[in-house]
């Protein structure tokens, strides 16, 4: 089946293309061409002219098991460990535990999907998420090795930093770890520990990095390693954000993640808005909107070594596309976007989320029952799977109707 998608603008993300469409092949899920309408397609999706097609957003850091709300354990803390202790001692943590893990994963997946995210990095041991990720409505990166953190506070995820990093290099996977998430003496040793293990390389993806010194950043840049920032979580826990201007000055590859909603943002759209505001507050100047787009598309694709398939709208790439309403200008549209500015989400050339007026298009992709109508943020939507039933089951596990702002659903219970 061949699909033709015609938005007002296409952002590749490095180039802006007008008055063209995207041909995609459902058989392999890939983009065939960006061109005029030159041959009949099985499905034609003609979008309003005030829409922009971006590569499907990539959330570079989440913990899907922590898909709950509200935030717990506000700082300032000196290290993540005191926040984690506060979380696990809280009544909310006990409340969350009533929900089976698979349903927490479903909540996290739908949280990401309705904000335009098509791929997420779920930082957790494989034994936790392996049984879930193929059953979710979004892509979860499968090929990675990991540590929890590189310090004495490490929760002992994986088989040890040296073993996990070696495995990453041998398989051309990313090695993912938290780094220097805090300011005490032990937290600040993270890069030194990585160097001792020989684990600071182009395969290394480090999250948070609040305590990174200039020397650390020089070492990271020299190694061509990657950094991920989660400013909402960082500010909630530590009342500061990472030294992003210093990261950018060294041409380090930087991506954006949400962390879990129990310390971080409710979705990538909130994360973008807070990043814009916090950067201006810290440095007295704006972070470029194009840079932010790169932080949720091509940069994480490079970091997680999936940039031959994801992160771009180009022929041969997987047809994961997020359609956003035009607001202000091309790049500021993602900064200004909220729930109802996500016009449509496409994965592998198939529509997985859209406004209800696209129902006839949905029916061409799915038999009845494989998608559902939902009211999200006061608008009727179509979405893959049965989100209404999932939410009712979650309420059943809890024994009450829980308001979760990352899924603003209207539902009788």
Predicted regions, residues:
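Catalytic beta/alpha-barrel core
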Residues: 203-213, 228-236
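Short, acidic/turn-prone active-site loops that include or flank metal/cofactor-
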Residues: 144-149, 231-236, 259-262
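Active-site microenvironment of metallo-dependent hydrolases
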Residues: 1-40, 81, 91-119, 124-125, ...
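Metal-associated gating/positioning segment near the N- to mid-region
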Residues: 48-108
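Divalent metal-coordination and catalytic microenvironments
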Residues: 8, 22, 29, 50, ...
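Metal-coordinating catalytic core of metallo-dependent amide/deamination hydrolases
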Residues: 95-96, 101-103, 120-204, 211
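Glycine-enriched alpha-helix->loop->beta-strand junction motifs that scaffold or abut catalytic
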Residues: 171-173, 199-204, 219-228, 249-254, ...
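His/Asp/Glu-enriched, well-ordered alpha-helical/loop segment
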Residues: 197-200, 245-326, 336-348
């Amino acid at each position: 089946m061949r699909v033709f998608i015609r938005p007002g603008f296409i952002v590749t993300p490095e180039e802006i293309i007008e008055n063209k469409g995207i041909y995609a092949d459902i058989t392999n899920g890939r983009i065939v061409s960006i061109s005029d309408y030159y041959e009949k397609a099985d499905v034609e999706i003609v979008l309003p002219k005030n829409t922009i097609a971006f590569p499907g957003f990539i959330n570079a850091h989440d913990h899907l098991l922590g898909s709950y709300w509200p935030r717990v354990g506000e700082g300032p803390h000196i290290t993540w460990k005191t926040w984690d202790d506060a979380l696990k001692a809280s009544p909310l943590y006990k409340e969350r535990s009533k929900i089976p893990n698979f349903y927490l994963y479903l909540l996290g997946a739908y949280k990401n999907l309705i904000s335009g995210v098509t791929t997420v990095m779920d930082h957790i041991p494989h034994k936790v998420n392996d049984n879930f990720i193929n059953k979710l409505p979004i892509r979860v990166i499968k090929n990675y090795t990991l540590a929890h953190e590189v310090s004495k506070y490490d929760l002992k995820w994986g088989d040890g930093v040296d073993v996990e990093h070696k495995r990453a290099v041998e398989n051309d996977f990313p090695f993912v770890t938290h780094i220097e998430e805090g300011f005490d003496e032990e937290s600040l040793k993270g890069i030194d520990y990585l160097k001792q293990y020989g684990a600071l390389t182009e395969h290394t993806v480090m999250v948070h990095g609040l305590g990174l010194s200039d020397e650390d950043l020089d070492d990271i840049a020299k190694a061509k390693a990657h950094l991920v920032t989660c400013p909402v979580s960082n500010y909630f826990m530590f009342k500061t954000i990472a030294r992003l201007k210093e990261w950018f000055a060294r041409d380090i590859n930087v991506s954006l993640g949400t962390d879990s909603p129990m310390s971080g943002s409710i979705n990538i759209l909130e994360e973008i808005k807070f990043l814009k505001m916090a950067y201006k507050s810290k440095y007295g100047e704006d972070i470029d909107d194009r840079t932010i787009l790169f932080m949720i598309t091509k940069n994480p694709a490079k970091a997680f070594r999936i940039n031959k398939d994801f992160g771009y709208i180009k022929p041969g790439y997987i047809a994961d596309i997020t359609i956003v309403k035009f607001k202000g200008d091309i790049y500021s549209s993602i900064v200004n976007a909220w729930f109802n500015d996500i016009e449509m989400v496409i994965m592998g050339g198939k529509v997985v989320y859209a406004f209800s007026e696209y129902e006839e298009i949905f029916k061409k992709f799915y038999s009845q029952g494989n998608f559902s109508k939902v009211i999200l943020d006061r608008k009727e939507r179509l979405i893959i799977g049965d989100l209404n039933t999932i939410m009712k089951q979650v309420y059943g596990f809890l024994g009450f109707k829980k308001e979760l702002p990352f899924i603003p659903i209207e539902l009788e219970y």
